């Protein structure tokens, strides 16, 4: 999630509960998801993956005899009575498994992953999940510099104010599994992003000193049916970094705003939206293709986004704004011209590529913004939504049960994950009759 307002979006799912460090007795059952690895020569081959909810979503309770209460709240270190030190946290906080992910708004069906923001009983799980490898003990590490990532999406139930996010985070492959974090990736530990949030546990360990959790973040997709946004966020540190004080702030070690790619921000208002008048019609499912284009030395130079719908390739839009280079890709010249100062200072596109080369974890979520109504994504210069239209109270009037479905996650060589369906040429009809 690419904005500080993500914090407000998450509080509804936390309900005062955060991840414990000692697994409990309730079984964890991960939904299975079929994904694909692609080459131009061999096509796309299926692979087995699993989905795990973020550790913050798992049920938590204090160990027996420690009284009622949780093990901490978002934005703060854990309470000292149960977490005076890391070792005590590991003993005193019990994290239970989740036997039925559907109760948290997460279901899979073959190649499809469905995330529900609101359940029929009114609960708001706002799930965030990660992609596990076939062992279920490690995250699937994506190395995408010089490659492309593609998925199909149904965004029809995402009105103004909603955000379906699919992005990459430079988390540890095991979720930083350790003596005091025995669950690791199996329980969804180790989250970080470029916002450097403070959470009671970082890498599964009690965050006694209240540090922030920072790492490189590549927002492949943050969107609803009215607006879309792509943004690389770089940090000048490798992997998960524990920040303190000013390091966690805007001028710190990570680029919080990113270099954003949104058609509305460059005066292209007919490219993406609900209806046939838009090139990408979000009233129907479509395919999202993101290419991470490298030079001959293997350094990331450009990020190229385009779509496929109804069998036709919809090429990326070109910028249409004075002072902005005429381009249809994210590249350093564009980022510098749009005021992405921190992005340029902290490593720019090459720095993002270095993280993509080291390997990043795929995260997927759905959320709303109780504080800012997601207006950074879809209002004003960013999109067509009216002021206040994205308030949660209005979202449920437009769509009582917001959800998103991601299907056919696939990645591989440039040009290997998508195809344009060529319509057959009409056969010549019979010649004129000569009666």
Curated annotation (Swiss-Prot):
Residues modified to Pyrrolidone carboxylic acid: 21
Gene3D superfamilies referenced in this protein's UniProt entry, alphabetically: Glycoside hydrolase, family 7, domain
Reaction catalysed by this enzyme: Endohydrolysis of (1->4)-beta-D-glucosidic linkages in cellulose, lichenin and cereal beta-D-glucans
GO cellular component term, pick one: extracellular region
Primary location recorded for the protein, binned into one broad class: secreted
Residues bearing attached sugar chains per UniProt: 109, 267
InterPro entries, alphabetized: ConA-like_dom_sf, Glyco_hydro_7, Glyco_hydro_7_sf
One MF term in the entry's GO annotations: cellulase activity
Cystine pairs: 38-44, 71-93, 83-89, 160-385, 192-215, 196-214, 235-254, 243-248, 259-335
Enzyme Commission code: 3.2.1.4
Location(s) in or outside the cell: Secreted
Active site as annotated: 217, 222
Keywords of this entry: Carbohydrate metabolism, Cellulose degradation, Disulfide bond, Glycoprotein, Glycosidase, Hydrolase, Polysaccharide degradation, Pyrrolidone carboxylic acid, Secreted, Signal
Keyword Signal listed: yes
Any GO BP: cellulose catabolic process
Signal peptide from the UniProt entry: 1-20
UniProt function note: The biological conversion of cellulose to glucose generally requires three types of hydrolytic enzymes: (1) Endoglucanases which cut internal beta-1,4-glucosidic bonds; (2) Exocellobiohydrolases that cut the disaccharide cellobiose from the non-reducing end of the cellulose polymer chain; (3) Beta-1,4-glucosidases which hydrolyze the cellobiose and other short cello-oligosaccharides to glucose.
Family: Belongs to the glycosyl hydrolase 7 (cellulase C) family.
Protein's recorded name: Endoglucanase EG-1
Organism of origin: Humicola insolens (Soft-rot fungus)
